[in-house]
Regions:
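Short beta-strand micro-motifs enriched in acidic
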Residues: 41-45
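Short, mixed charged/polar active-site loops
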Residues: 37
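Negatively charged, low-complexity tracts enriched in Asp/Glu with abundant Ser/Thr
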Residues: 1-33, 46, 52-61, 66-94
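Acidic, low-complexity intrinsically disordered segments
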Residues: 84-112
């Protein structure tokens, strides 16, 4: 008799969200189904970006990967405070950006 393997399907905390035809290289979106929030990732080595008035006031943080690479993460759609406690624990926007950066750095950046 064949043994059945059980697999627990869990909602991922972060997903890479891409608009392939519209997004130039150096930009990605990260979506969090737990917090119903969207983050824009800007690779600053390849993109020089001046944030408009709307984006300047959104929560953002700069992460330095190494001496050549740095990334700016900006919360574009922010439901972190509204959804905290429902699908995930309550956290600050800075903690949310740090967790998103950790996920992005681990899964999307090729370490050399």
């Amino acid at each position: 008799m064949q043994k059945i393997k059980r697999f627990e399907l869990k909602m991922p905390k972060f997903l890479l969200a891409v608009e392939p035809k519209r997004m130039p290289n150096g930009f990605h979106f990260i979506y969090s189904p737990h917090y119903l929030s969207l983050i824009l990732v800007i690779r600053e080595r390849t993109q020089q970006v001046a944030l408009n008035d709307e984006l300047v006031h959104k929560p953002h943080k700069l992460y330095i990967c190494n001496e050549y690479e740095q990334f700016k993460l900006i919360i574009i759609q922010n439901n972190v405070k509204l959804t905290g406690g429902e699908l995930a624990p309550e956290i600050s926007e800075t903690q949310f950006l740090d967790e998103a950066w950790q996920w992005y750095n681990t899964n999307m950046i090729i370490q050399e």
